[in-house]
């Protein structure tokens, strides 16, 4: 008989311990599979705001790093930018989920994302024993940008031109957790506001990451009452067209498919409002959230 089963039946006192052991051991094949691999995590939503969720996220990330996974965090902070802008008398406007960014707004973006939000995350990870390093797109050419396609409406919103993977790899090899703020600059020294989902996508592709995981505030992609377990490109285009996918979910979904096309194998959207959702996603047999797949009914539908 399986020794774990006999423990369950012979001593009820030991049953809870055995159950915990069973949960922990379920992680072993995944730890073996992912050791030395790179995960890019887009950190956003409540998991960046609520104290309990922030701490649980930081513990999860630290644990992933400690078991040998190269974790690269790319953070958002759209709400924080909006609040800082308001205090300075600037009104935020969005076009298809992207912030209209003039000269004043780019200053607010830079000081909020790179100055405050980034450093708060670094401190949080450090508190939990994760050795994190704050990186903005400007450090060591981490994110070189070009003006985005809708520049006449959006202003200084950039697209990623290139990523300095050597620098990010160097940090990972040193056992550090790069925490990247999504601002970039171009050859003329102009600074650009880059949507964090787009930045995460480009970084995941450039690093040839094993996974890109979006941590957001939703259980997954919602259609009516249903949360989709998988979504393919054609469905997503229809849902955007019909307004079923809207606002900040549009850049997330578009960047997810760009990442899939760019060769990253697994892309997940998980709920940051759910404590330890990251660990559950990676280390248990049951996947959660929505997985992005190229086409419906192909073999990519298996979990992780
Ligand atoms: N079909 C949909 N399914 C889930 N969320 C959606 C959908 N359409 C629009 N949304 C909205 O998109 C938001 C996520 O985008 P955003 O706020 O930019 O996330 P984050 O700040 O985590 O990057 C959700 O909070 C939700 O209100
Ligand atoms: C161009 C653009 O819209 N940039 C975003 C950058 C931050 C971000 O993406 O934050 P979330 O992930 O929290 O939405 C912004 O200014 O809000």
Swiss-Prot record:
Primary location class: cytoplasm
Catalysed reactions, as listed in the record: N-acetyl-L-glutamate + ATP = N-acetyl-L-glutamyl 5-phosphate + ADP
UniProt-recorded Gene Ontology molecular function terms: acetylglutamate kinase activity; ATP binding
EC number of the protein: 2.7.2.8
Pfam families in alphabetical order: AA_kinase (PF00696)
InterPro entries: AceGlu_kinase-like_sf, AcgluKinase_fam, ArgB, Asp/Glu/Uridylate_kinase, NAGK-C
Any Gene Ontology biological process: L-arginine biosynthetic process
Residues that coordinate or bind substrate: 77-78, 99, 193
Record-linked Gene3D superfamilies: Acetylglutamate kinase-like (3.40.1160.10)
Coiled-coil regions listed: none
Pathway: Amino-acid biosynthesis; L-arginine biosynthesis; N(2)-acetyl-L-ornithine from L-glutamate: step 2/4
Family: Belongs to the acetylglutamate kinase family. ArgB subfamily.
Official protein name in the record: Acetylglutamate kinase
Species of origin: Chlorobium limicola (strain DSM 245 / NBRC 103803 / 6330)
Taxonomic path: Bacteria, Pseudomonadati, Chlorobiota, Chlorobiia, Chlorobiales
Gene: argB
